[in-house]
Curated annotation (Swiss-Prot):
The keyword Nucleotide-binding applies. The modification Phosphothreonine is found at T157. Changing K271A: Partial loss of kinase activity. Complete loss of kinase activity and of nuclear localization. Residues 309-321 have a biased composition (Pro residues). The gene is Cilk1. The keyword ATP-binding applies. ATP binds at L10, G11, D12, G13, T14, Y15, G16, S17, V18, K33. Pfam families: Pkinase. This is Serine/threonine-protein kinase ICK. Disruption phenotype: Knockout mice manifest hydrocephalus, polydactyly, and delayed skeletal development. At cellular levels, ICK knockout results in abnormally elongated cilia and compromised SHH signaling. The modification Phosphotyrosine is found at Y159. GO terms for cellular component: ciliary basal body; ciliary base; ciliary tip; cilium; cytosol; nucleus.
Length: 629
């Protein structure tokens, strides 16, 4: 020890203390670990696990044991000096680590751990204090005092590792554990590096199990039968907890990090990945092209594809969010090339990109820069036919120009990305056809509501809208059912005053449709009234596409109009009005309803007293529908 000088004490542990020293010959800083117990022979020293393991382990991410010195029955280990440990690095942080730094730290830990496990050892005491650092750029595993050989025989001691990083099989006093306990500790350390707080800070072993259950949820007996055997052996009752989403606990972690963390923290040690398997997770795959494959790299895949046949058709799962704009990928936007579409019509399972998949189907043809489905003549009719069956309508031929996008998922603003392309003529034709179809659909819907056309004839719209409208007609609300009931059993229906043979004339005194807003009616009822006014004006002799003539009395005069609650009186059947040309307009009185009518004076009936003013908001049904005599 006369070749080294001690500077200060760095720390004190269970089995020894660590001093900072310097080599007199080279001036290099070193860490001197002085064991507390005395050793009286070299054979006794060489039997130490730390010496046995570190003699065989030489790796960039494992702290290097430079020398072993026994002097005056005291044993000294000379290690390379590292500035700090991971616990100190976490404690000194006042903000979260960037994910690139965390990925670098975890990669080095798993690299060193894979080397340890490969050489037949497992650490048994992984924690941030035993991971020595030179900043976040360099991390090394240290303190192999509890390390054991994997091939050594159990039983092992059940108090190994610090409680917060102890695997559940060790917490349940298992004596038959192995290297997966190191993988569990790595998962706990990874979560702590992300959040700067321990994931399972239990005050005792049982409290630590409770903390684990609160995060991961109570394991099922089928998921980990050995754990239930261990718990029953120590009379431990599992707390009933539901799992928490790790993304909510660690919001700054990416989805790849959550995937790795979830697998590292599996209850069953057999389901945890090994350290070498964890290094192959997507979390550590950096710099690989996302969705962009060169021609050279695509050749072997194409040959394999030709031998094995085309990939199977996989039905896409419905997206959780609104479907993204599909096939708006344009060569002028290279930044979007790495993002696959979330709602594609024919996704295939695999690592090849969408462009290469289409090139396989096209038997080696070069893929187009955009809209790959334009050149796909074989798949296009089949997929379009299936889409037409799903949507229940026949698409215009010009719609095929945009390939495999269903009409139901295409919004009106989805063509914004195509402004710079020369598709204006076909777009104009499609807009005209769509407007015409929409106007026809609107007219058919109004005619079916007004009973000018049977409901089965509404077939030009989509099947969904037809079903929805028929469902609304078949299952009316309670309010509309009441109206239909009373209107069906009364002789007084809205729209006509039979005393003077009067029908409202929209050309003169009929109020505009927007005046219904003052009466509290919805926009739908006002639109219906405006349509009624149009059809009424048709009856006065103007030309109409619906083909109504002057002598035709439409059936909407016998039904309710929108949500209007007013009533009218029918003319006697013996003397019908000669025509609509002799009808006069009804001028609504201020403060009275629009379709106000006067009672018919019939000889032989007692004259009706004036109706009392109803309470505001209520309908006086007794005055509106008196009993028949």
């Amino acid at each position: 020890m006369n070749r080294y000088t001690t500077i200060k004490q760095l720390g004190d542990g269970t089995y020894g203390s660590v001093l900072l020293g310097r080599s007199i010959e080279s001036g290099e800083l070193i860490a001197i670990k002085k064991m507390k117990r005395k050793f009286y022979s070299w054979e006794e020293c060489m039997n130490l696990r730390e010496v046995k393991s570190l003699k065989k382990l030489n790796h960039a991410n494992i702290v290097k044991l430079k020398e072993v010195i026994r002097e005056n029955d005291h044993l000294y280990f000379i290690f390379e000096y590292m500035k700090e440990n991971l616990y100190q690095l976490i404690k000194e942080r006042n903000k979260l680590f960037p994910e690139s730094a965390i990925r670098n730290i975890m990669y080095q830990i798993l690299q060193g751990l894979a080397f340890i496990h490969k050489h037949g050892f497992f650490h048994r005491d992984l924690k941030p204090e035993n991971l020595l650092c030179m900043g976040p750029e360099l991390v090394k595993i240290a303190d192999f005092g509890l390390a054991r050989e994997i091939r050594s025989r159990p039983p092992y001691t059940d108090y190994v590792s610090t409680r917060w990083y102890r695997a559940p099989e060790v917490l349940l006093r298992s004596t038959n554990y192995s290297s997966p306990i190191d993988i569990w500790a790595v998962g706990c350390i990874m979560a702590e590096v992300y959040t700067l707080r321990p994931l399972f800070p239990g005050a005792s072993e049982i409290d630590t199990i409770f903390k684990i259950c609160q995060v991961l949820g109570t394991p099922k007996k089928t998921d980990w039968p050995e754990g239930y055997q261990l718990s029953s052996a120590m009379n431990f009752l599992w707390p009933q907890c539901i799992p928490n989403n790790l993304k909510t606990l660690i919001p700054n972690a990416s989805s790849e990090a959550i995937q790795l963390l979830r697998d590292l923290l599996q209850w069953d040690p057999k389901k945890r990945p090994t350290a070498s398997q964890a290094l192959r997770y997507p979390y550590f795959q950096i710099g690989h092209p996302l969705g962009i494959i060169s021609k050279d790299s695509g050749k072997p895949q194409r040959e394999v594809q030709d031998k094995t046949g085309p990939p199977p058709y996989i039905k896409p799962a419905p997206p959780a969010q609104a479907p993204a704009k599909a096939y708006t990928l344009i060569s002028s936007r290279p930044s979007q090339a790495s993002q696959p579409p979330q709602h594609s019509v024919h996704p295939y399972k695999g690592d090849v990109s969408r462009t290469e998949q289409l090139s396989h189907v096209q038997e080696g043809k070069p893929s187009p820069p955009f809209f790959p489905s334009l050149h796909n003549k074989n798949l296009q009719p089949k997929i379009l036919a299936s889409l037409e069956q799903k949507n229940g309508e026949i698409k215009p031929k010009s719609r095929r120009r945009w390939g495999l996008i269903s009409r139901s998922t295409k919004g009106s603003d989805d063509w914004a990305d195509l402004d710079d392309l020369d598709f204006s003529p076909s777009l104009t034709r499609i807009d005209v056809k769509n407007k015409k179809r929409q106007s026809d659909d609107t007219l058919c819907r109004f005619e079916s509501v007004l009973d000018l056309k049977p409901s089965e004839s509404v077939g030009t719209g989509t099947t969904v809208s037809t079903q929805a409208s028929s469902q609304r007609r078949d299952t009316p609300t309670l309010q509309s059912s009441a109206k239909q009931h009373y209107l069906k059993h009364s002789r007084y229906l809205p729209g006509i005053n039979i005393r003077n043979g009067v029908l409202p004339n929209p050309g003169k005194d009929f109020l505009p449709s927007n005046s219904w807003s003052s009466s509290g009616l919805s926009g739908k009822s006002s639109g219906t009234v405006s349509v009624v006014s149009k059809i009424t004006s048709v009856g006065s002799g103007s030309a109409s596409s619906s083909g109504l003539t002057g002598s035709y009395i439409p059936s909407f005069l016998k039904k309710e109009i929108g949500s209007v609650m007013q009533r009218v009186q029918l003319a006697p059947l013996a003397a019908p009005p000669p025509g609509y040309s002799s009808l006069k307009a009804v001028r609504p009185h201020p403060g009275r309803p629009f379709f106000h009518t006067q009672p018919r004076s019939t000889p032989g009936l007692i004259p009706r007293p004036p109706a009392a003013q109803p309470v505001h908001g209520r309908i006086d049904w007794s005055s509106k529908y008196p009993s028949r005599r």
